[in-house]
Amino acid sequence: MNPYRRATLLCSVGLGTTLTFASSHWLLAWMGLEINTLAITPLMAQHHHPRAVEATTKYFLTQATAAAMILFASTTNAWMTGEWSINDLSNPIASTMFMAALALKIGLAPMHFWMPEVLQGLDLLTGLILSTWQKLAPLALIIQTAQTIDPLLLTLLGISSTLVGGWGGLNQTQLRKILAYSSIAHMGWMIIVIQYAPQLTLIALGTYIIMTSAAFLTLKMSLTTKISTLATTWSKSPILTSTTALVLLSLGGLPPLTGFMPKWLILQELTKQDLPIIATAMALTALISLYFYLRLLYAMTLTISPNMINSTTPWRTQTTQTSLPLALFTTAALGLLPMAPAILMLTT
């Protein structure tokens, strides 16, 4: 793609998200979401591969459906209450429809069906944008309207997302699909606590973006998209393979890595809200997700591909291309847990 076109589309993606952030009127928020969708679509189909075109079509259809539901919900709320403000979502039918539309936009279960298939058809950098930046605008709207949405609906969406995110990743061999189910599970953790402590949702979102960015960038640098090729990476770049393994464990929420911090804080908040059953259910679903991350770690470190000619690491490995964003994201994805009290203090 022409660099000028790519820059224009990336600026439009940022403009759509910023417009949604800054809007207090439903039509402006809807317009920002639409600019975002229309700008990301050419980036998804830029390689003209049949899988990429198929993924782009699926993404466009689901996002268009969600946008129509948002427009219908906002019109219904304005008709029933006379208010177009985002903070005045008082009609229960409109609020439920609005939450369903945003759940479809960010891939919450049971509206998650498009996420793994779309991510599988994209390259790793576009998949990174889809998994991180594209979640910001819908989550901002959910945070603004969380107090008007039925708590039972949010709880069901949160638990089902963490369950589906863990269960769906068990049988996968493609790393992009595994990261898609990881995204679904992390969205569930954010939604479950959004009514009680929105600042914890922001902490979980920040750590999710850091860990997912580190995971996508390490996989891109090692040119790995399948579990079967993970076994060959250690002989090419042992340091990068070790980094990838630690980042995946951080995504799974294993202490003492960064990914444990949001889960620990969210479970603590749910316990404070006298919701021990929900906290226990969330902790158990996190174990399912941790299992398939450990499976990736096993394939990466303890297995050898039958196609390998040399079974030992050469004494001199090729120098990997340095990447400043990868170094920053990886460092943050592995070492932020000791700073948890300071981060919590800054957000409250």
Curated annotation (Swiss-Prot):
Major site of localization recorded for this protein: mitochondrion
InterPro entries: Complex_I_Subunit_2 (IPR050175), NADH_DH_su2_C (IPR010933), NADH_UbQ_OxRdtase_chain2 (IPR003917), ND/Mrp_TM (IPR001750)
This protein's UniProt keywords: Electron transport, Membrane, Mitochondrion, Mitochondrion inner membrane, NAD, Respiratory chain, Translocase, Transmembrane, Transmembrane helix, Transport, Ubiquinone
Compartments where found: Mitochondrion inner membrane
Name of the featured protein: NADH-ubiquinone oxidoreductase chain 2
Enzyme type, top EC level: translocase
Function: Core subunit of the mitochondrial membrane respiratory chain NADH dehydrogenase (Complex I) that is believed to belong to the minimal assembly required for catalysis. Complex I functions in the transfer of electrons from NADH to the respiratory chain. The immediate electron acceptor for the enzyme is believed to be ubiquinone.
Cellular component GO terms, alphabetical: mitochondrial inner membrane
Matches recorded under PANTHER family: NADH-UBIQUINONE OXIDOREDUCTASE CHAIN 2 (PTHR46552:SF1)
UniProt catalytic activity: a ubiquinone + NADH + 5 H(+)(in) = a ubiquinol + NAD(+) + 4 H(+)(out)
Family assignment from sequence similarity: Belongs to the complex I subunit 2 family.
Swiss-Prot/TrEMBL GO biological process terms: mitochondrial electron transport, NADH to ubiquinone
GO molecular function list: NADH dehydrogenase (ubiquinone) activity
Membrane topology, as annotated: Multi-pass membrane protein
Organism encoding this protein: Cyprinus carpio
Keyword Membrane assigned: yes
Pfam families: NADH_dehy_S2_C, Proton_antipo_M
Membrane-spanning intervals of the chain: 13-33, 60-80, 93-113, 149-169, 178-197, 202-219, 246-266, 274-294, 326-346
